[in-house]
Design a protein with these regions (language model features):
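FAD-site-proximal beta/loop scaffold in flavoenzymes
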Residues: 107, 112, 118-134, 229-280, ...
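Residue-level detector of alpha-helix initiation sites
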Residues: 11-12, 106-108, 146-148, 272
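Glycine/small-residue-rich loop that forms an oxyanion/phosphate-binding "nest" at active or ligand-binding sites
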Residues: 72-134
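A Rossmann-like FAD-binding core segment of flavoenzymes
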Residues: 65-89, 94-97, 157-255, 294-298
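Beta1-alpha1 glycine-rich phosphate/pyrophosphate-binding loop at the start
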Residues: 3-68, 138, 148-175, 190
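Phosphate-coordination loops involved in phosphoryl transfer and adenosine-cofactor binding
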Residues: 2-4, 73-74, 136-138, 192, ...
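Internal hydrophobic alpha-helix adjacent to the cofactor/substrate pocket in enzyme cavities
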Residues: 23, 154, 158-164, 281-299
């Protein structure tokens, strides 16, 4: 099966790229990447013209993209080159495209502490909207200080959890508006503290924290731990084509979302762009599609 453009990833960046490329008259196929982080966001207030859950917005994007592209519900396992063609191999088929757009996003960054992996699914979670309802009326800790952590804490409070935010610094990185919502709900914050280990028997029962100011450990009883300490880019597939990445693993792109490999473009959270938001991911996708169109037009 041959296409003009293959888009790997179906979050905001990938779906926008598919819409724009399809409207340019290109034959486009979109492959599922990691589940989009947007689908787990409980509420969105900074995407112009839309207020609602991330899942609702993503479903609208998928519906629109389906008018301009094919959608393969297959996992991409490898990418390569065959002459002028890029080859995309899934767990069940093989596809060829003249250009490729990586919109693979990222996955949750781990703390790397004892008990984290052992209690995953038994009190440890990386998705408040997925697992929060299991902890109604129970005590939970949210680890982190950015937008995701604060949003998770607010959401968990709203559904009836006893929430405490734990942050390693003395001030949050989250947007001011989110911070105001957090404090308005009287959600307590444990400042200047990091997780040492997560303990329990069959499930999470307590978390050992380290106070960086006092330089001492202390214990907090908890039934759940929601970890929101950032993302790790999913760029291993792009690297197989020789695409350059920075020291953190993000794909290097120019203002046109072009990589160092002709015909290979990238968009969204997998790129080294400074701001990672839904609206910027969509912009990246549009630019990447335009660049792919210009690349194919020259060829």
């Amino acid at each position: 099966m041959e296409y003009d453009v293959a888009v790997i990833g179906c979050g905001p960046a990938g779906l926008t790229a598919a819409i724009y490329a399809g409207r340019y008259g290109l034959k486009v196929i979109v492959f599922e990447g990691m589940p989009s982080q947007l689908s787990t966001v409980p509420f969105i207030e900074n995407y112009p013209g839309f207020e609602g859950s991330g899942y609702e917005l993503l479903e609208k994007m998928k519906e629109q993209a389906s008018k301009y592209s094919e959608h393969a519900f297959e996992r991409v396992v490898d990418v390569g080159k065959d002459g002028d063609w890029f080859v995309v191999k899934t767990d069940s088929s093989e596809y060829k495209a003249k250009a490729i757009i990586f919109a693979t996003g990222g996955t949750h960054r781990e703390l790397g502490v004892p008990g984290e992996k052992e209690f995953l699914g038994r009190g440890v979670s990386y998705c408040a909207t997925c697992d929060g309802h299991f902890f109604r009326g129970k005590k939970v800790l949210v680890i982190g200080g950015g937008n995701t952590a604060v949003t998770d804490a607010i959401y968990l409070k709203e559904i009836g959890c006893d929430v405490t935010l734990v942050h390693r610094r003395d001030e949050l990185r989250a947007d001011k508006a989110l911070q105001e919502e957090l404090f308005k709900r009287n959600i307590p914050v444990i400042w200047n503290s990091v997780v040492v280990r997560i303990e329990g028997t069959q499930k999470v029962e307590r978390v050992v924290l380290h106070d960086k100011i006092k330089d001492e450990d202390f214990v907090v009883e908890a039934d759940g731990v929601f970890i929101a300490v950032g993302m790790r880019p999913q760029t291993e597939l792009a690297a197989k084509l020789g695409v350059e990445r920075d020291s953190r693993g993000y794909i290097k792109v120019d203002r046109r979302q072009r990589t160092n490999v002709p015909g290979v473009f990238a968009a969204g959270d997998c790129c080294d762009n400074p701001l990672k938001q839904v609206v910027t991911a969509c912009g990246d996708g549009a630019v990447a599609a335009n660049s792919a169109f210009e690349f194919l037009k020259v060829k």
